[in-house]
UniProtKB/Swiss-Prot annotation:
Role played: This protein is one of the two subunits of integration host factor, a specific DNA-binding protein that functions in genetic recombination as well as in transcriptional and translational control.
Disulfide bond sites: none
Organism expressing this protein natively: Edwardsiella ictaluri (strain 93-146)
Family: Belongs to the bacterial histone-like protein family.
Protein name: Integration host factor subunit beta
InterPro entries the record matches: Hist_DNA-bd, Histone-like_DNA-bd_CS, IHF-like_DNA-bd_dom_sf, IHF_beta
Lineage of source species: Bacteria, Pseudomonadati, Pseudomonadota, Gammaproteobacteria, Enterobacterales
Keyword DNA-binding: yes
Domain of life per record: Bacteria
Keywords noted in UniProt: DNA recombination, DNA-binding, Transcription, Transcription regulation, Translation regulation
Gene name tied to this protein: ihfB
NCBIfam families reported for this sequence: hip, PRK00199.1
Residue ranges the record marks as coiled coil: none
Quaternary structure annotation from Swiss-Prot or TrEMBL: Heterodimer of an alpha and a beta chain.
GO biological process: DNA recombination; regulation of DNA-templated transcription; regulation of translation
Amino acid sequence: MTKSELIERLASQQPHLPAKAVEDAVKEMLEHMAATLADGERIEIRGFGSFSLHYRAPRIGRNPKTGEKVELEGKYVPHFKPGKELRDRANIYA
């Protein structure tokens, strides 16, 4: 599901809200979540999961085209850990 598909579905389920208001709300929520992670904070949505940052240590990688070694810096990457309810629902369809 893409962001536009999510907005479309939410707007169709809430016909009393203008589609633009739903779009603005979704964009604002995602922007706030990104800013929270950028500040190094953890986000927990009960029943859904949690978002946090994990540190990737510096390492030596390879350029896939040339095969030459490339030094990669350490960095933080977003990490999502699904909650129990989400895992259980996903296993129904697996």
